[in-house]
Amino acid sequence: MSDQVGQGRTAAVTGAANGLGREIALQLAAQGYRVFASDVVEQESNDLCTASNGQVSLSLTDITDGDAVATWVRDVTDEVGEAGLDVLVSNAGILTPGPLEILPLRAIKHEFDVNVFGGVAVINAFLPALRTARGRIVSIGAMTGRFPLPFNGPSSASKATLEALADVYRAELKPFGVQFVLAQPGNLVTDGTAKTAAALQRVAEAMTDEQKALYGGEFAKFSAAFSTVQSEGLHAQEAAARIVEIVEAQPAPIRAAVGEDAEQLLRFVREKSEEDLDELRRRYAGLA
């Protein structure tokens, strides 16, 4: 990976139509990168090229569709040519809140399809180009990968899987000079915050009377607490700036917290007992 910052280098970013991914793509472009972005959402991405002065191109790509991934990666690989790809930011992800007992299994599977298997498909498809450039992969995990929360089970579990995959990829790719970094954001204020609030409301409204008797009260507390901590989180532009720092950092970090809340919580996870963590887990989720 070249020491030259940005200029003349290339990056691919998934989940880039809005939110954190969009800011990452734009800030990489501002640093001189040529950015190949993708997202499953088209209508929210029309201004990316204009906003980046033509430095960002966006492909409508569903990362859970193997053929779509192969087509996008082939197009990008043709564009970068013999130089290969310098950076891949694997950012695409979704959030499926709710009590594990009542969430449809298909919803949990879909979260893993996007957050885990889709990410793996993109990473593996880009590896030949990344090996050529001796590039860097930045996988966007979350602090909940180390500190799972009640009513956030599928997301926490998928992010924990990314933690394990990061360790394995880092070891397997070291002989090729490809670096693998796991970014661990805390709470973020993005244009997806309203979507999360709507998802929480849909779960509550879909509960049967029996499910409400079991979980309604605690889920309402969680929803209120979750909305509060999200509103107090790092803004997407600030988080993206930190991600760009991680992209450029020499030497590459193994893991990197994004936001003061993530730094504090991950330190707590390292230092405290399981009993302390269980108590904090419920308190953080607004349940104690």
Task: State what each model feature region is.
Residues 91-96:
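Conserved NAD(P)H cofactor-binding loop of Rossmann-fold oxidoreductase domains
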Residues 17-18:
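Conserved glycine-rich cofactor-binding loop
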Residues 175-252:
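SDR active-site lid
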Residues 31-46:
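Conserved glycine-rich Rossmann-like NAD(P)H-binding loop of the short-chain dehydrogenase/reductase
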Residues 123, 158-161:
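Active-site helix of classical SDR
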Residues 61-74, 105:
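The beta1-alpha1 cofactor-binding region of Rossmann-like NAD(H)/NADP(H)-dependent oxidoreductases
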Residues 99-100, 107-109:
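Substrate-binding pocket helix/loop in short-chain dehydrogenase/reductase
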